[in-house]
């Protein structure tokens, strides 16, 4: 009975698992672009401001230019670093979690039924 039930469930899970990995792949891809986007957001602002300031005045503003980018860069970099490891970590536990959830209840349920019947009888 156990062998028969396990294969059936595994077959049903096979398509589900196949779908889950596919979903995880796009999710990870979406997260990866998001990470670069965060650093890129300040970057586009810096280049756009850099040419404008350079055009306006190279000598007086160079001192302010490095200060302005450094101040915004440091705070974003700190949150980005913790977020970068945090993003990859959730997706990795997710794939094992879905298979474990369905598998854990199945084995306990099967033994529970016979265990209850044994004492009952």
UniProtKB/Swiss-Prot annotation:
GO biological process, one term: enamel mineralization
GO molecular function: structural constituent of tooth enamel
Coiled coil: none
Annotated region described as Disordered, given as residue ranges: 1-20, 32-121
Extent of Pro residues compositional bias: 85-111
Signal peptide: none
Keyword Repeat: yes
Subcellular location: Secreted, Extracellular space, Extracellular matrix
Pfam annotation, one family: Amelogenin
Physiological role: Plays a role in the biomineralization of teeth. Seems to regulate the formation of crystallites during the secretory stage of tooth enamel development. Thought to play a major role in the structural organization and mineralization of developing enamel.
Protein name per UniProt: Amelogenin
UniProt organism field: Ornithorhynchus anatinus
Upper classification of the organism: Eukaryota, Metazoa, Chordata, Craniata, Vertebrata
């Amino acid at each position: 009975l156990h062998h028969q039930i396990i294969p059936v469930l595994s077959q049903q899970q096979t398509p589900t698992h196949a779908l889950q990995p596919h979903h995880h792949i796009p999710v990870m891809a979406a997260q990866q672009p998001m990470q670069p986007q965060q650093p890129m957001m300040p970057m586009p602002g810096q280049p756009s401001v850099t040419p404008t300031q350079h055009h306006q005045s190279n000598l007086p503003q160079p001192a302010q230019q490095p200060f302005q980018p450094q101040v915004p860069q440091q705070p974003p970099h700190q949150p980005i670093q913790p977020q970068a490891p945090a993003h990859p970590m959730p997706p990795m536990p997710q794939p094992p979690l879905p298979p474990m959830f369905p598998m854990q209840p199945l084995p306990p349920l099967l033994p529970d039924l016979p265990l209850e019947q044994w004492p009952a009888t």
